[in-house]
Structures are given as C-alpha cells and as structure tokens.
C-alpha cells in the first residue's frame, strides 16, 4: 500500500487550477488527479463574455497548459463528469463508468447557468453564457 496520498480535484476551471498551483507551491508531493466534464484544459471564465466574443483569435484564456500540468505531475481526466461520490469507499464514479480512488477530494465545480422557465421556447437566438462553447456561439 502506498503512503503517497491522492488528491482528486473535481472541476477543471479556475478554482481547480488554483488548487493545483497552491498544492504544489506548498510542497505537496502526492498524486493529483484533475477531473472535468469539459474537454478543455482549465481556462479563465471572465473573458468569455468579453474578449472571446470580440477577439476570439487573439484571446488566451488557458490557465494551465497540457505541458504545465504534466510538469506539475497532474493526471487530467477531461470530458468525463462525476456522477457519484462514495465517501466511505473514497471513490468517485465517472460518466463513462470508470471509478477513481482518492484520499482527499476537493469539489471545485463552480456553477451552472440557470435556465429560466420556457427558455427553449424563446428560440435559437437566446443564449446562456457559462462555458467556452457558449461564448463561441456568440462570436459574430
């Protein structure tokens, strides 16, 4: 049995990325697994409503590159959300049926855009803005 702890961070956004940087800055040497339901690496959300729409080709929103995550020794699971947390077994179950074990679990999932009643009836020109795809849909 390994004495190196595994920290699983659920949520690959700004909070998840910040947690990784803080863990490593504070000399945490254990295993870190970052789990996100989006296919993108961690990125900043504030520019989604501004820069990404106005200057999509020039806007850099990525917080941690694939290389930086590798340098930090982080295993990344993308496009695969968590469907269940089993705190007794210390595991999370993913959408694809896989299970991931943890010693410590950090939930950094953020929020979701609230869809008002009858939202879909408003037509294809009404949007929510929560993720990169939402922002890209608004680019002229």
What residue ranges belong to the model's regions?
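FAD-binding core/adjacent interface of flavoenzyme oxidoreductases
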Residues: 1-8, 62-140
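Beta1-alpha1 glycine-rich phosphate/pyrophosphate-binding loop at the start
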Residues: 2-75
